[in-house]
């Protein structure tokens, strides 16, 4: 599943590069869109199943910086599901070039 995100000025630091922590927000949007695409929202999962998602572990390799006004593509894939865990693999690209 892919999500497109435009980098806004608020996402950047003084050099107009995406501030490193903001990539986590972009990845969260990708996971949320993944669930929406399956017909779920965080609110209906909590109401119906009485649970919510927490991020226990996250590893990021910063390969190349993104800049103000870039259009990024976040790809989200589920790689493993158990009764209590979902493992996602995500990456961020611009024009098919890997950034994160």
Where are the predicted features?
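Hot-dog-fold acyl-thioester-processing enzymes
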Residues: 1-56
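HotDog/MaoC-like acyl-thioester-processing domains
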Residues: 1-3, 36, 66-71, 79-100
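Acidic side chains
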Residues: 11-13, 61, 70
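Short, structured secondary-structure boundary patches
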Residues: 23, 64-66
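Short, intrinsically disordered/low-complexity patches at protein termini
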Residues: 42-44, 59-60, 92, 97
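Short structured motifs
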Residues: 57-62, 74-75
């Amino acid at each position: 599943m892919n999500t497109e995100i435009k980098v806004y000025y608020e996402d950047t630091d003084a050099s107009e590069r995406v501030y490193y922590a903001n990539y986590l927000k972009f990845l969260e949007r990708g996971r949320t869109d993944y669930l929406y695409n399956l017909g779920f929202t965080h609110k209906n999962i909590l109401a119906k199943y009485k649970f919510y998602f927490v991020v226990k572990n996250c590893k990021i390799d910063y390969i190349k910086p993104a800049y103000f006004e870039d259009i990024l593509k976040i790809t989200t894939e589920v790689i493993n599901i158990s009764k209590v865990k979902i493992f996602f693999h995500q990456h961020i690209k611009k024009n098919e070039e890997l950034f994160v």
